[in-house]
């Protein structure tokens, strides 16, 4: 029965039971196998090899179907190449398709310009067009999605109507269903993405758990791996933002930068391990390796420099600039530290301003600030002098003061303290820290404390290991002493005048 009804069809080769049976005018066809090209009538330039290959083709031309049931239901589609058992099985009028592999594109009906390579690749595609699926089960659930490129074992396996996607790598974009305009490259990249769109995930498991998050850019192995609904994020580097779930508008650049961020938003972490432990802290900017490493919920911080603010956990509104600046700060807030290791030892101190290398740090001279607040420290214990072009001006408006009485000290107080000539030394070694031959004039804080008593004002014992005094507070005492001396002088003048009258 091969070519049984052929009338004027020329240059045909029909081999096998019922092959080309109903061909009438079709020309230059090659049908090999039982029922191959069975229903072909006017279709020409076709090559059908295999049992029932192209069995239902009627008018389709320039097709190549190789394998059992390959192109079985094709009727009028043209320029198709189906190779493999069941490849293009349900294709009807779809044209310009290339399906290679067992059941590749088996349910395609009218979809055109598709390329499916691999076992069951694009097997459920119906009307989707301009797709390229390469790898076993790649895009196997795609139905109407178009302009997709899936490369790798099970890449884009669950995609149904999602379009304009590029998935490359084993199981890349595996669960994507309707997500559009995504680019996933790497094994399991964007594995759980379903409807998330406009994402770019590059690297093994990059964006692995992303579901509906959109407009994300993750580059690096495990970058943004746990992101689910977070959007508008940029993560670059191994494990960068890997634990982020719903946090959005973040930029993490560097190995493990912002790794533990979950819901924090609007953060910028640049440098390996920068913001590593941040979870919900938001509006932070950490620049430098390990900057803000242990920050968890602290927000509105700016750390720039290697390990700057590394130990900060919940401290907020801090600005640390310099190598290890604010290194030990944990919950201290509203601080500004600028300089190499500035404020290094501060832990809970708040509202401090430290300027200069090692400012607020040291075992001698300037205090080693840890928990103190509301301090302004400029420089360190090695600075020999402070210079300014004009005098300091302090607020002294009576309207801003609550008066508690007059200064109780005067000449008697001054007589009990002794000015000393000195130079600073390292308390531990006894070595001078001042320039050799340079001396200073001042007082002993211990001596002034002893004279002031229980409620000191001029001297401070807030830190028993770093006694301090405010020399300006001696000015009112000097004024009182001058007044006392002036009164005594006036009394003496009156007495002298009285004695002169008597004489």
Report the location of each language-model feature.
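C-terminal intramolecular chaperone/auto-processing assembly modules
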Residues: 459-503
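C-terminal accessory segments
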Residues: 403-417, 439-451
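Active-site and glycan-interaction determinants of carbohydrate-active enzymes
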Residues: 445-464
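Acidic, glycine-rich loop-and-strand cores that form catalytic or ligand-binding grooves
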Residues: 410-426, 431
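Extended alpha-helical scaffolds used as interaction platforms
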Residues: 7, 13-15, 30-32, 47-49, ...
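Small/polar residue-rich beta-strand/coil "junction" motifs that cap repeat-based extracellular fibers
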Residues: 220, 254, 334-410, 415
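Conserved SAM-binding site of S-adenosyl-L-methionine-dependent methyltransferases, i.e.
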Residues: 2-4, 9, 19-21, 26, ...
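Glycine-rich, low-complexity segments
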Residues: 5, 22, 294, 382-406, ...
């Amino acid at each position: 029965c091969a070519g049984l009804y052929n009338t004027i069809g020329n240059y045909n080769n029909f081999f096998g039971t019922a092959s080309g049976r109903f061909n009438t005018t079709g020309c230059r066809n090659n049908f090999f196998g039982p029922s191959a090209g069975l229903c072909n009538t006017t279709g020409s330039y076709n090559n059908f090899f295999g049992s029932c290959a192209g069995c239902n083709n009627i008018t389709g031309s320039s097709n190549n179907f190789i394998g059992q049931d390959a192109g079985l239901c094709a009727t009028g589609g043209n320029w198709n190449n189906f190779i493999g058992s069941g490849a293009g099985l349900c294709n009807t009028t779809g044209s310009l398709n290339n399906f290679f592999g067992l059941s590749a594109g088996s349910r395609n009906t009218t979809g055109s310009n598709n390329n499916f390579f691999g076992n069951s690749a694009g097997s459920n595609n119906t009307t989707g067009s301009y797709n390229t699926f390469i790898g076993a089960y790649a895009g196997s659930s795609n139905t109407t999605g178009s302009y997709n490129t899936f490369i790798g074992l099970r890449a884009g396996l669950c995609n149904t109507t999602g379009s304009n996607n590029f998935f490359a790598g084993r199981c890349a974009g595996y669960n994507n269903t309707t997500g559009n305009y995504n680019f996933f490259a790497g094994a399991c990249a964007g594995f759980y993405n379903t409807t998330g769109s406009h994402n770019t995930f590059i690297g093994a498991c990059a964006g692995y758990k992303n579901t509906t998050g959109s407009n994300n850019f993750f580059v690096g192995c495990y970058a943004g791996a746990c992101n689910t609904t977070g959007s508008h994020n940029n993560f670059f580097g191994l494990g960068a933002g890997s634990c982020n779930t719903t946090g959005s508008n973040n930029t993490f650049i560097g190995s493990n930068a912002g790794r533990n961020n979950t819901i924090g938003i609007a953060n910028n972490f640049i440098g390996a391990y920068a913001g590593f432990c941040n979870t919900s802290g938001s509006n932070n900017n950490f620049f430098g390796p390990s900057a803000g490493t242990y920050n968890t919920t602290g927000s509105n911080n700016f750390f720039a420099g290697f390990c700057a603010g590394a130990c900060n956990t919940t401290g907020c509104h801090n600005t640390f600039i310099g190598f290890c600046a604010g290194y030990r700060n944990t919950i201290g807030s509203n601080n500004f530290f600028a300089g190499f290791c500035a404020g290094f030892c501060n832990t809970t101190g708040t509202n401090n301003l430290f300027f200069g290398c090692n400012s607020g740090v040291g075992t001698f001279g300037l205090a080693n600030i840890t928990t103190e607040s509301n301090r302004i420290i400029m420089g360190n214990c090695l600075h020999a002098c402070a210079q300014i072009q004009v005098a300091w001006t302090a607020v002294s408006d009576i309207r801003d003061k609550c008066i508690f009485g007059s200064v109780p000290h005067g000449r008697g107080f001054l007589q009990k303290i002794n000015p000393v000539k000195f130079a600073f030394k390292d308390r531990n070694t006894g070595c001078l820290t001042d320039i050799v031959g340079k001396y200073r004039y001042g007082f002993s804080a211990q001596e002034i404390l002893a004279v002031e008593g229980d409620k000191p004002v001029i001297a401070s014992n807030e830190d028993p290991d770093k006694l301090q005094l405010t020399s300006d507070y001696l000015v009112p005492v000097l004024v009182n002493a001058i007044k006392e001396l002036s009164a005594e002088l006036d009394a003496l003048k009156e007495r002298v005048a009285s004695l002169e009258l008597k004489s």
